[in-house]
């Protein structure tokens, strides 16, 4: 049997995509709308406290197209904590007007090979650079791109039948492309084998949305992607600050 890849795991992630029920929202009087938005604001203030004490992260983006209107991206140190946030959000009055359209569960991961290389032989979990990758601060970039992906298991193009050394070399070459976009695109890789329908959830952040097109296009021509990758739906959106929510929901 081929050797399975070993990973270091950090925060658990929930991408929660919602569509606004504008027809139902319009039926509410402005007073009720304001009460719901205030309740949402208090919820987000509590989320900010958790972020400030280093026990999690979150961000909100407005999604383009008809797949969703919003994505709430939340990171926590356990599935229980993540589920608690999800349940509390669903109990908000405004949640009745935010219809679920898609979700994705994963855990921020780093390959043991890369983590050991970064740590130089020391305990990777005590290395500042490794910890920054496993427990990332979400950048306030203008745009987000999220997509799930898996590795193929199709005849000769079966990623999991390749020897470990060949997989490592392919990933190393693939990673060089990503590193060439340092400063332009920040990525968070969430492992989701056994958690969701695909094997990874990829989240990209950038101030220039065209960088998403450039990096994904370039990676498509790399062998690790061209031969062995399968992709789900892509979601792209714009940063939505908490103070901008009232404007979004104003009819």
From Swiss-Prot:
The active site is at residue 147. Pathway: Porphyrin-containing compound metabolism; protoheme biosynthesis. Fe-coproporphyrin III acts both as a substrate and a redox cofactor. Was originally thought to use heme as a cofactor. Its cofactor is Fe-coproporphyrin III. InterPro entries: CHDC, ChdC/CLD, Dimeric_a/b-barrel. Pfam families: Chlor_dismutase. Involved in coproporphyrin-dependent heme b biosynthesis. Catalyzes the decarboxylation of Fe-coproporphyrin III (coproheme) to heme b (protoheme IX), the last step of the pathway. The reaction occurs in a stepwise manner with a three-propionate intermediate. Transmembrane segments: none annotated. It comes from Listeria monocytogenes serovar 1/2a (strain ATCC BAA-679 / EGD-e). This is Coproheme decarboxylase.
């Amino acid at each position: 049997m081929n050797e399975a890849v070993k990973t270091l795991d950090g925060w658990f992630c929930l991408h929660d995509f919602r569509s606004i029920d504008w027809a139902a929202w319009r039926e509410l009087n402005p007073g009720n709308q304001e009460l719901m938005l205030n309740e949402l604001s208090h919820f987000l203030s509590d989320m900010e406290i958790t972020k400030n004490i280093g026990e999690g992260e979150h961000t909100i983006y407005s999604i383009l197209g008809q797949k969703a209107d919003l994505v709430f991206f939340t990171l926590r140190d356990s599935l229980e904590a993540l589920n608690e946030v999800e349940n509390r959000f669903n109990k908000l009055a405004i949640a009745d007007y935010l219809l679920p359209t898609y979700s994705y569960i994963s855990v921020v991961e780093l390959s043991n090979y890369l983590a050991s290389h970064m740590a130089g032989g020391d305990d990777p979990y005590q290395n500042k650079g490794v910890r920054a990758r496993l427990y990332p601060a979400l950048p306030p970039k203008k745009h987000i791109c999220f997509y799930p992906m898996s590795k193929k298991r199709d005849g000769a193009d079966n990623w999991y039948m390749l020897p470990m050394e060949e997989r490592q070399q392919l990933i190393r070459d693939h990673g060089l492309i990503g590193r060439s976009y340092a400063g332009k695109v920040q990525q968070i890789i969430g492992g989701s084998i056994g958690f969701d329908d695909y094997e990874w959830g990829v989240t990209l952040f950038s101030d220039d949305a065209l960088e998403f097109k450039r990096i994904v296009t370039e990676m498509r021509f790399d062998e690790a992607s061209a031969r062995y990758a399968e992709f789900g739906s892509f979601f792209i959106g714009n940063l939505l600050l908490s103070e901008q929510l009232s404007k979004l929901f104003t009819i």
